[in-house]
Amino acid sequence: MSLKQQLESDFEGHKRWALRRQMGIPNNRRLWVCACMDERLPVDDALGIRGDRGDAHVFRNAGGLITDDAIRSAMLTCNFFGTEEIVIINHTECGMMSAQTDTIVKALKDKGIDLDNLQLDPDLPELTLKAGMFGKWVKMYQDVDETCARQVEYMRNHPLIPKHVTISGWIWEVETGHLRPPHFRIGEKVNTNKAMGAK
């Protein structure tokens, strides 16, 4: 291949990458991921994907929670960008389990922040947290397994997510560096004599 041919080929690849939305090209795996923003959760490695190469749309927030903005993003990718699978990843030792909601509310109020009638979106003034609603909005939680399972069911039943989309939830174990389904801890299955079938 001549240098000219190589450069033309490279250009075509760059053009295809830059214009993939205009050309109707979905992400490579037709995948949308919602994961916690925690740096200990290596989404690409955990799922065996290359986000930097276009394998998935990855949405990250505190806790990997299905919020209104997560629904907005999932709705767009599933209905308009060809996405056919959703994976939700929560993780052990998540900061969203590290404090009670009341503690968060008090800490912010102690900083002088008014949490009553808090506007969430300047373009949608209707999206305002009324007095006492901030705690529900911030979504601190107690149990990572319950939270993950509940989010999967919520997405499966959401009217903006097409019914054909495959949806699963997983827990990243920070302590082992592996994914597992909610409510299944391998360590509990192999580390007791009862689990091992002792008589």
From Swiss-Prot:
One of its GO terms (biological process) is hydrogen sulfide biosynthetic process. It catalyses: carbon disulfide + 2 H2O = 2 hydrogen sulfide + CO2 + 2 H(+). It holds the Pfam family Pro_CA. Keywords: Hydrolase, Metal-binding, Zinc. Catalyzes the conversion of carbon disulfide into hydrogen sulfide and carbon dioxide, with carbonyl sulfide as an intermediate. Likely plays a key role in sulfur metabolism that allows A.thiooxidans G8 to grow on carbon disulfide as the main carbon and energy source. Does not show carbonic anhydrase activity (hydration of CO(2) to carbonate). This is Carbon disulfide hydrolase. GO terms for molecular function: carbonate dehydratase activity; hydrolase activity; zinc ion binding. It comes from the Bacteria. Binds 1 zinc ion per subunit. InterPro entries: Carbonic_anhydrase, Carbonic_anhydrase_sf. Its cofactor is Zn(2+). It is an enzyme of class 3 (hydrolase). Its EC number is 3.13.1.5. Exists as both octamers and hexadecamers in solution. The hexadecameric homooligomer may form a catenane, through interactions of two interlocked octameric rings. The gene is csh. Belongs to the beta-class carbonic anhydrase family. Zn(2+) binds at residues 36, 91, 94. Pathway: Sulfur metabolism; hydrogen sulfide biosynthesis.
